[in-house]
């Protein structure tokens, strides 16, 4: 079961070793981004991979994902997505005692010490958070710095982020495009509001911005 934010990378990274080791595979891509998997299925067919070696099932996670996890003829589940989804997969897989491998949501720490190349590291860390329109679980979104250099770090981060081009993803200069869906956009807005309510300092951006 693969997520929407890296719809080719995640599929290939799971499928390639599976096929190479002689195992059959059943893929359920994210219902938000299924088209890449359809292309991969066509490629597998054109490559004359025997019928039944690669199987593609589209559908909603709580329906198809649960059926796959609980199915006694599936020996292992490989899941990449949210922690909530991972818990559901683990529970549904328990009765058949199948192996479960999971890569779930993260809040990656980025530790920058006083003797580091401070400006370069702050700037690079802030910019990495914008990759894939900020929709990556491995983005270093939790930056830990010496408290004595907080104001300096804020200024460097602000200067970096305010140079990021938001726009049409088809334009070469664009760094941040639209989020994957309206519901994801609203979730981000809600998280910004929650952060401010809990005492976070808004360095740049804010409500109404991705």
List each model region and its residues.
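Rossmann-like NAD(P) dinucleotide-binding subdomain of oxidoreductase/dehydrogenase enzymes
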Residues: 1-120
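ALDH superfamily catalytic-core signature
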Residues: 70, 76, 84-210
């Amino acid at each position: 079961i693969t997520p929407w934010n890296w719809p080719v990378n995640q599929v290939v990274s799971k499928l390639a070793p599976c096929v190479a080791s002689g195992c059959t595979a059943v893929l359920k891509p994210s219902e938000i981004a299924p088209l890449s998997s359809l292309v991969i299925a066509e490629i597998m067919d054109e490559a004359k991979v025997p019928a039944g070696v690669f199987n593609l099932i589209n559908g909603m996670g709580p329906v198809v994902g649960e059926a796959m996890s609980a199915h006694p003829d599936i020996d292992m589940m490989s899941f990449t997505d949210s922690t909530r989804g991972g818990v559901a997969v683990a529970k549904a897989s328990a009765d058949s005692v199948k192996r479960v491998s999971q890569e779930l949501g993260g809040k990656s720490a980025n530790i920058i010490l006083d003797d580091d190349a401070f400006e370069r590291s702050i700037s690079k860390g802030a910019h990495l958070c914008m990759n894939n329109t900020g929709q990556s679980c491995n983005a270093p979104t939790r930056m830990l710095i010496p408290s004595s250099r907080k104001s300096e770090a804020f200024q460097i981060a602000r200067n970096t982020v305010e140079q990021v081009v938001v726009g049409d993803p088809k334009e070469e200069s664009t760094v941040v495009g639209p989020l994957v869906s309206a519901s994801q956009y609203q979730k981000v807005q809600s998280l910004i509001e929650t952060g401010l309510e809990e005492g976070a300092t808004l360095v740049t951006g804010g409500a109404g911005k991705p």
